[in-house]
A protein has these predicted regions:
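FabD-like malonyl-/acyl-CoA
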Residues: 1-144, 194, 271-305
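Alpha/beta catalytic cores of group-transfer enzymes, especially the acyltransferase/condensing modules
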Residues: 10-12, 39, 103-253
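Short loop/edge segments at beta-strand edges and connector loops
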Residues: 230, 258, 298
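A short, well-structured juxtamembrane/interface segment
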Residues: 255-263
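Non-catalytic positions within long, well-ordered alpha-helices that form the structural scaffold/packing
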Residues: 265-268
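Post-His helix in hydrolase/transferase enzymes
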Residues: 309-312
Length: 312
């Protein structure tokens, strides 16, 4: 058995996430206390009580998801004291920060401050209504990229996430995204507009990438205890000098999730823990590598299942 740890990204948030884990785990509660102190505000109250409209704001959702994922991991480690480190870890977009905290490369406090700044910068990079994101299904990647070139007409539109076979997310100017969507539908594919606050992971995020680069100059990065498969190149990295470069490139670069999962399988990974809110990654993994066994751990009941899963 070879295990990977996977950490979810933005969109997995919900009011009350992790509440039963906090109730059962002093270690998880300590994580939330550290996050509140680091941000000098009661983010934990927003996570647990809402309102949902405030939690979904990018500058709140990003630190909230990292906090919850790290709290769940703390509860797992508390419950399974002899838990072995994974062979590899990966996070979907924002989740890469959670993975770096799990590996000891980033301090929790630095991570939540970083993603607070990252979230604000991503929100401010594009005015409301200017950008859009759509999920595309039923079109091959090469053909979709050709559609993006055809539909751009001087605007930005490109693949943002290669999530799973048959599911690619595009991002860019709203008009260009709409034109690509029309081409997709004409080609018998499907295009679903996603409700997000900004067109993440495309060239419009270049100003946000510069902000993240500046913020990272103030943050120490240690050598991760295990390699992290980076979003932008789907390759394992354990070099602290490259962590910052990869995080900067990630802001306006493509999330290569399908390729990342395939890289983990090629490295021998047979089992994975999805650590944090939701079960989005387990669903994607099932479409990428159906033989890879995944346990989604986002509540207290799942924490209790970890020992049996990793021991079996």
């Amino acid at each position: 058995m070879t295990i990977a740890w996977l950490f979810p990204g933005q969109g997995s948030q919900s009011v009350g996430m992790g509440s039963d884990v906090l109730a059962a785990s002093p270690a998880a509660r300590a994580v939330f206390q550290r996050v509140d102190a680091a941000l000098d505000e009661p983010l934990s109250k927003l996570i647990l009580d809402g309102p949902e409209a405030d939690l979904t704001v990018t500058a709140n959702a990003q630190p909230a998801i990292v906090a919850t994922s790290c709290a769940v991991l703390a509860a797992i480690r508390e419950r399974v004291p002899d838990l072995a480190p994974p062979a590899l870890a990966a996070g979907h977009s924002l989740g890469e920060y959670s993975a770096l905290v799990a590996a000891g490369a980033l301090e929790l406090e630095d991570a939540v401050r970083l993603v607070r700044a990252r979230g604000r910068a991503m929100q401010e990079a594009v005015a409301a209504g200017v950008g859009a994101i759509s999920a595309i299904m039923g079109v091959e990647p090469e053909r979709l990229e050709a559609f993006c070139v055809e539909a751009a007409q001087g605007e930005v539109v490109s693949p943002a996430n290669f999530n799973a076979p048959g599911q690619i997310v595009i991002a860019g100017h709203a008009g260009a995204v709409a034109r690509v969507s029309e081409l997709v539908v004409a080609a018998k594919g499907r295009a679903i507009a996603l409700k997000v606050s900004a067109p993440f992971h495309c060239a419009l995020m270049a100003p946000a990438a510069r902000v993240v680069e500046r913020e990272l100059t103030r943050v120490p990065i240690a050598r991760p205890a295990f390699p992290i498969v980076a979003n932008v190149d789907a390759r394992p990295n354990a070099d602290p000098a490259r962590v910052k470069e990869l995080l900067v490139r990630q802001v306006d670069g493509v999330v290569r999730w399908e390729e990342s999962v395939r890289a983990m399988v090629a490295a021998g990974v047979t089992h994975a823990l999805e650590i944090g809110p939701g079960k989005v990654l387990a669903g994607l993994v099932k479409r990428i590598a159906k033989d890879l066994k995944v346990l989604s751990v986002g509540d207290a009941a799942a924490v209790e299942q970890v020992a049996g899963f990793v021991g079996g």
